[in-house]
């Protein structure tokens, strides 16, 4: 392999020092692709196909350099020439192939599959504009297309192409591959992304609006196109079928190339269905097998023995149910198969709760996955128990052997080695590099003798990361941040169950408290980051309130020195890699029972933030690992919440009437906020909280404020706080996605 200088010299006939950052980025892109191209693809007989609507992979340059073992030498060569890798990275556009935790998990998982030397590819779609680019203007979210595709990128066009049949036409796909090199492995896997050459961005008008009926030109333009109308729902079905039909044809082709006669397909392939978006892969595989001469009974048996389903939510809205008539309109050739699968279920089980097609002729995708797959897993211990005992109990009673838990994880290469090199290098220095391959070795931090030196170093690393974030936000948004403040951070997609509205009510509490003369020991900066779906009005209203409070506080000289609210624009993986290492307080405040797992909680913990959270998702396992004294838990537990729902016993108006709560909620529609906000938005949110509050914000609000105030007080005892930080970092090893993927392989995939 050439040195970077030799590669640059050959490409530009210049030295590194003479090149612009743009030239160096393109050189490094191609240098990394060359290094990766020299690694063979994993070729084990059996392969996992991880099918997902999202892969939130983030910028790939540094991540790939780390995995290829080139990062340190490249960084040194650049530094010797007076160049900074972090500045060159700014040139790279972040791939817009995902939105939230689902897509980020998929990205961590394909990294770990490759790093463990397992044979497995991600399969998805190549969205041209992703979800959207968020612009914050007039205290509101606006949306524009997020253009990220360029002539030179990580995508490599392959020669594979498939015919995908719809009711009235057939589309021809193009397959693009992105290499996924494992961490210092001799081999690699790939992310396989299907696209259409006919897609045309000129049909986009006015933000992210476009003709939803022009399938040949719109199919892969956007992730999750607005489905608030019939055409939007149909487009989602077109997208999902395009993804799974291509994926299924790829699976069959690759198995045949390895010697399969298709009767033994399950010996060659396992399909992991990531949430319900890829569920049509089940009837599509059955269709393709029967077309190739396999009897229907055998085809069903084969598919049942090679598909596994990961459930990511108990929110009914997210468990997809498509009207049968929509499927008849888009994929009529799948409908007889789905009806036959449903007929077999109804012949055996009379309970309507487990039927695939319900009495309203809606097709329940998760039900099909459970009946016609061999594994169903939740993504955190609590989540899996809720599935077994509540949400999917009717299925658990039938198939207890199918249900298993696989607590989510994160790749430490992205979220520690890349995002927080200062901490990563310090851990190498005092613990050695063993944790790179076995994250449980971080526990050695607990027995490291010179605790005082560790605490001093952790303080300086956190201060460095706060300055780094402040510089980044100054460049990106022009916002000035006090780096001596406590950094309190909530970054995740906007949804009522994640309760950004509760954090906003805390901000109001703190604002009024400071106005009353109660000055905090040091300044507090509250960061929010996340996008709201364009059709999700209340989520947009929550963003509006946050931005209004930011303005009210900034314009109040009595409060501004002590409190600041920052909404990070267009939150993405890049922003997260600046925010997470700088964080003191990690906000994980979903209503108990609603967050399947969460992975932000793990990233913050690994980077030395303390969790403020409910007993929900993976917070439960974090609490078990670190102990009650090293996490800040508030709010009602999941059993209480589930019981309140079951009895319709929660009345938000009763909580609103409380002395500690009413002034905070009323402030949403106060003159101060209305002066900078939109009356319609603020009143709608206010009425939602006092009359409905489906995700029980007011139920937990008082306890949330109390525990957060305790946390702020505890922060002032730096010695005790840093003891807690050390425990959190040391215990984070369990949440490595390498551990999660090893468990998927051992219990579900059986690749080796």
Task: Enumerate the language-model features and the residues they cover.
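A conserved ligand/cofactor-binding region detector
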Residues: 1-752
């Amino acid at each position: 392999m050439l040195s970077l200088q030799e590669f640059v010299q050959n490409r530009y006939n210049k030295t590194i020092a003479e090149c612009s950052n743009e030239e160096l980025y393109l050189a490094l892109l191609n240098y990394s692709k060359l290094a990766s191209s020299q690694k063979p693809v994993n070729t084990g007989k059996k392969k996992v196909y991880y099918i997902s609507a999202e892969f939130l992979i983030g910028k790939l340059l540094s991540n790939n350099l780390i995995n290829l073992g080139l990062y340190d030498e490249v960084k040194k060569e650049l530094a010797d020439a007076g160049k900074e890798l972090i500045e060159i990275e700014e040139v790279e556009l972040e791939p817009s192939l995902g939105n939230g935790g689902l897509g980020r998990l998929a990205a961590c998982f394909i990294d770990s599959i490759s790093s463990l030397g397992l044979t497995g590819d991600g399969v998805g779609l190549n969205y041209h504009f992703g979800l959207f680019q968020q612009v914050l203007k007039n205290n509101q979210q606006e949306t524009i297309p997020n253009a990220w595709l360029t002539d030179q990128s990580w995508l490599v066009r392959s020669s594979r192409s498939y015919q995908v049949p719809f009711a009235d036409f057939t589309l021809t796909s193009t397959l693009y591959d992105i290499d996924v090199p494992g961490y210092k492995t001799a081999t690699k896997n790939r992310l396989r992304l299907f696209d259409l050459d006919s897609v045309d961005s000129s049909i986009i008008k006015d933000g992210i609006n476009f003709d939803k009926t022009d399938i040949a030109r719109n199919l892969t333009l956007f992730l999750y196109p607005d489905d608030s109308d019939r055409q939007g729902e149909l487009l989602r079905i077109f997208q999902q079928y395009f993804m799974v039909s291509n994926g299924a044809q790829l699976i069959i082709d690759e198995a045949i190339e390895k010697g399969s006669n298709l009767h033994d397909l399950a010996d060659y392939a396992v399909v992991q269905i990531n949430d319900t978006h890829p569920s049509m892969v089940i009837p599509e595989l059955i269709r393709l097998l029967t077309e190739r001469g396999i009897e229907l009974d055998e085809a069903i048996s084969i598919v049942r023995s090679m598909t596994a389903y990961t459930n990511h939510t108990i929110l009914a809205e997210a468990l997809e149910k498509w009207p049968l008539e929509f499927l008849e309109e888009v994929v009529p050739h799948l409908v007889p198969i789905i009806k036959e699968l449903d007929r077999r279920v109804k012949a055996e089980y009379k309970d309507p709760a487990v039927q695939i097609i319900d009495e309203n002729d809606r097709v329940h995708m998760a039900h099909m996955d459970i009946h016609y797959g061999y594994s169903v897993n939740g993504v955190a211990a609590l989540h899996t128990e809720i599935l077994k005992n509540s949400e999917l109990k009717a299925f658990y009673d039938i198939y207890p052997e199918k249900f298993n838990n696989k607590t989510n994880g994160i790749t430490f290469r992205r979220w520690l080695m890349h995002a927080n090199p200062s901490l990563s290098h310090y851990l190498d220095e005092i613990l050695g590099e063993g944790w790179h391959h076995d994250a449980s070795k971080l526990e050695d931090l607990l027995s490291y003798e010179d605790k005082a030196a560790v605490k001093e170093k952790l303080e300086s690393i956190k201060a460095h990361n706060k300055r780094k974030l402040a510089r980044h936000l100054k460049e990106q948004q022009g916002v000035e941040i006090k780096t001596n403040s406590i950094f309190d951070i909530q970054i995740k997609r906007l949804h009522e169950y994640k309760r950004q509205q509760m954090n906003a009510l805390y901000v109001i509490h703190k604002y009024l408290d400071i106005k009353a003369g109660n000055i905090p020991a040091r300044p507090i900066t509250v960061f929010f980051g996340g996008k709201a779906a364009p059709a999700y009005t209340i989520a947009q209203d929550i963003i509006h309130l946050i931005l209004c409070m930011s303005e009210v506080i900034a314009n109040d000289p009595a409060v501004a020195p002590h409190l600041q609210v920052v909404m990070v624009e267009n939150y993405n993986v890049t922003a997260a890699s600046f925010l997470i290492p700088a964080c003191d307080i990690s906000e994980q405040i979903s209503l108990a029972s609603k967050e399947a797992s969460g992975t932000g909680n793990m990233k913050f913990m690994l980077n030395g933030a303390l969790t403020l959270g409910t007993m929900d998702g993976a917070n439960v396992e974090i609490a078990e690992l670190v102990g009650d004294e090293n996490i800040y838990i508030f709010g009602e537990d999941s059993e209480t919440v589930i019981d309140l729902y079951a009895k319709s016993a929660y009345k938000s108006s009763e909580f609103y009437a409380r002395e500690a709560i009413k002034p905070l909620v009323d402030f949403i529609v106060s003159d101060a906020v209305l002066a900078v906000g939109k009356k319609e938005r603020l009143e709608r949110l206010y009425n939602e909280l006092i009359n409905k509050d489906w995700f029980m914000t007011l139920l937990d609000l008082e306890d949330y404020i109390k525990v957060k105030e305790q946390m702020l007080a505890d922060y002032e005892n730096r010695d005790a706080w840093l003891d807690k930080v050390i425990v959190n970092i040391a215990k984070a090893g369990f949440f490595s996605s390498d551990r999660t993927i090893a468990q998927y392989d051992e219990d579900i995939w059986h690749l080796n």
